[in-house]
């Protein structure tokens, strides 16, 4: 694990921002930090970045308790972007890169590579105030990753981007992971979570209410519901399948086939169900309906009210 938090608690006046939150982030993974507004995600991120300190609990980074020098091994892109509007893009990028410990030569060399990669060489001498929100975010993304930190923390990194640039940044995040970086990814966009995250933690009301691998969580929260596209007679299916093990939820006639939704009493009945279907009709397609992370997010948060 590159990052672990143990029972982190943080109180602000009459508001308990974090209540014993523990997470474990594997190396070279994309880790989703999820939760409604005000759940405590940003407070946890600020503690990891040593912007604020916990009232109790510990943070461990790369095998040791988090210390001041670890700031150079962490890159943080906050949701609230901030660039000096009157400075030129190149000048400011150099300044921020030097703050992260890069020499002038290394900073300029790396920035030129990234500016060329993103096709933004012409921005170097522009003032920041001339950039759109999306353009400024590209600059901040670059200066966040430039010093090749072990851990990257992105808070709503796709905010303000058009679909093409969202895809660009997603691909770069996955490239960084493949190169060995670890990414903590905080967002409300559940489709992006499913696309790029390996593990997640869901925080609600200052507590960790769900953690684990994405695929495992989605399977565990399935309701044993299956869809079958078929050609044949619906009554043949109803007569064939065991009513004590399955129930037909719906059947809809399509242009070229029919679609039936069936609920099984347990997931172990999946193979038996498929064999019974094949013996009674022509099966075109058969799949289990796995809940989306959006569905699970809503279900867990509403259940925690």
Where are these regions (language model features)?
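Short, Lys/Arg-enriched, disordered terminal segments
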Residues: 1-3, 302-305
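ABC transporter nucleotide-binding domains
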Residues: 3-5, 10-204, 210
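Short, flexible helix/strand-to-coil boundary loops that buttress conserved ligand/catalytic motifs
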Residues: 70, 221, 301
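Generic structural signal for individual residues within well-ordered alpha-helical segments
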Residues: 93, 108, 115, 167, ...
């Amino acid at each position: 694990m590159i990052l672990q938090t143990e029972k982190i608690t943080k109180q602000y006046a009459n508001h308990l921002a974090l209540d014993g939150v523990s997470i474990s982030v594997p190396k070279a993974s994309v880790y989703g930090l999820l939760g409604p507004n005000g759940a405590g995600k940003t407070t946890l991120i600020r503690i990891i970045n040593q912007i604020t300190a916990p009232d109790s609990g510990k943070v461990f980074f790369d095998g040791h308790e988090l210390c001041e020098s670890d700031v150079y091994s962490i890159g943080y892109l906050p949701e609230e972007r901030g660039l000096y509007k009157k400075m030129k893009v190149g000048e400011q990028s150099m300044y921020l890169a030097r703050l992260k410990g890069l020499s002038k030569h290394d900073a300029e060399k790396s920035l030129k590579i990234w500016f060329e990669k993103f096709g933004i060489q012409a921005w170097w001498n522009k003032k920041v105030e001339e950039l759109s929100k999306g353009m400024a975010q590209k600059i901040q993304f670059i200066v966040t990753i430039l010093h090749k930190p072990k851990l990257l923390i992105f808070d709503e990194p796709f905010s303000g981007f058009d679909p093409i640039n969202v895809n660009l940044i997603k691909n770069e995040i996955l490239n960084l992971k493949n190169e060995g970086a670890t990414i903590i990814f905080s967002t409300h966009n559940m489709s992006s979570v499913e696309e790029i995250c390996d593990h997640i933690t869901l925080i609600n009301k200052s507590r960790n209410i769900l953690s684990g691998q994405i695929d495992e969580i989605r399977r565990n929260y399935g309701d044993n519901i299956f869809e079958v596209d078929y050609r044949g007679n619906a009554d043949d299916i109803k007569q064939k399948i065991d009513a004590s093990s399955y129930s037909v939820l719906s059947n809809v006639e399509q242009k070229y086939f029919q679609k039936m939704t069936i609920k099984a009493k347990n997931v172990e009945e999946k193979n038996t169900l498929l064999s019974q279907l094949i013996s009674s009709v022509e099966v075109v397609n058969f799949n289990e309906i796995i809940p989306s992370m959006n569905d699970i997010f809503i279900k867990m948060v509403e259940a925690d009210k």
